[in-house]
């Protein structure tokens, strides 16, 4: 299923609103879990991973009203490591969380281009608008200007172009003539010449609708006798290559893209915990069930079985609780 098509929300959601919800006893449970010596981590998992984000915000308000403390700050002081990072991520409203991830990717020395590419290439125009608004409110600067200050060259251009969210302007009508012309232009900008006209690739990949791009990719393969992905790999490199390939993958199948991100976050030595946490938290109320199905089809194992192999302790238990039962 391509990324711009809607799916039945309940099909995709692993974390749903708790029925018969009352924030006051939940806030009290959390207070008791962190009161005195030691912390009852399982009680924290049971409450926060089984409530929707909206309900968590209500619990935080009740916690403040009853006990005069900020819930997120209290959690930070009681927890540590990857488990703390995951639980704190759950407490952010969705767009503020993604704004924070983008801000963290750019602050300090070095830039985590992969995080920026992942978020900008996979969100809809409305989601990007909300993220930009949250970013400006929380950090007092423009996301677009910060990206321009922190990146350069063609990578900067593709990221700024993605921020406009033009691929989300979808109509069911695709002009076959324009799709063929775009495919010919891509071929002329890469395989046909020595060197590459990167701006032609960026313009077509970032400003055409997703439905249109699918037709372009089909026409391109007929002209070039190779896939658009293979051409991008041979014509570009580094972060620009990663950005272009991400646009193609998200256009073709968003759920497969996230399944791949989760798989490679855990495959091999070490775990990319930031990628694992961000994608499970941010997709849990959107389409994580659908991502789980694609994960199993693509890799022959379930997402939860890989989490069990690759993580441990309270961190593992919280992730498994968010992911829910196997497809």
UniProtKB/Swiss-Prot annotation:
Keywords per UniProt: Annexin, Blood coagulation, Calcium, Calcium/phospholipid-binding, Hemostasis, Metal-binding, Repeat
Listed PROSITE patterns: ANNEXIN_1 (PS00223), ANNEXIN_2 (PS51897)
SUPFAM superfamilies per UniProt: Annexin
Domain of life of the organism encoding this protein: Eukaryota
Chain's role: This protein is an anticoagulant protein that acts as an indirect inhibitor of the thromboplastin-specific complex, which is involved in the blood coagulation cascade.
Membership in a protein family: Belongs to the annexin family.
Name of this chain's protein: Annexin A8
Species of the source: Homo sapiens (Human)
Source taxonomy: Eukaryota, Metazoa, Chordata, Craniata, Vertebrata
């Amino acid at each position: 299923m391509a990324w711009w098509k809607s799916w039945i929300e309940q099909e995709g959601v692993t974390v749903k609103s708790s029925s018969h919800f009352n924030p006051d006893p939940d806030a009290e449970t959390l207070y008791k879990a962190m009161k005195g010596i030691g912390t009852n981590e399982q009680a924290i998992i049971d409450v926060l991973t089984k409530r929707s984000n909206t309900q968590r915000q209500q619990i935080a308000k009740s916690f403040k009203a009853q006990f005069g403390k900020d819930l997120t700050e209290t959690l930070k002081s009681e927890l540590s490591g990857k488990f703390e990072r995951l639980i704190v991520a759950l407490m952010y409203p969705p767009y503020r969380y993604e704004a924070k991830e983008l801000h963290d990717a750019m602050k300090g020395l070095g830039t985590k281009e992969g995080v920026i590419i992942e978020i900008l290439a996979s969100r809809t125009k409305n989601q990007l608008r909300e993220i930009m608004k949250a970013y400006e409110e929380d950090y007092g600067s423009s996301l677009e200007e910060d990206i321009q200050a922190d990146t350069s060259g063609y990578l900067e251009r593709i990221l700024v172009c993605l921020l406009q969210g033009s691929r989300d302007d979808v109509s069911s009508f695709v002009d076959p003539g324009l799709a063929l012309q775009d495919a010919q232009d891509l071929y002329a900008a890469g395989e046909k010449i020595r060197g590459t006209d990167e701006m032609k690739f960026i313009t077509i990949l970032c400003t055409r609708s997703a439905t249109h791009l699918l037709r372009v990719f089909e026409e391109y393969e007929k002209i070039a006798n190779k896939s658009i992905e293979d051409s991008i790999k041979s014509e570009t490199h580094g972060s620009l290559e990663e950005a272009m390939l991400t646009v193609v993958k998200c256009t073709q199948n968003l759920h497969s893209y996230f399944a791949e991100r989760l798989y490679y976050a855990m495959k091999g030595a070490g775990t990319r915990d930031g990628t694992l946490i961000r994608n499970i938290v941010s997709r849990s109320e959107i389409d994580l069930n659908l991502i789980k199905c694609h994960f199993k089809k693509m890799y022959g194992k379930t997402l939860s079985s890989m989490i069990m192999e690759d993580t441990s302790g309270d961190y593992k238990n919280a992730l498994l609780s968010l992911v829910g039962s196997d497809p």
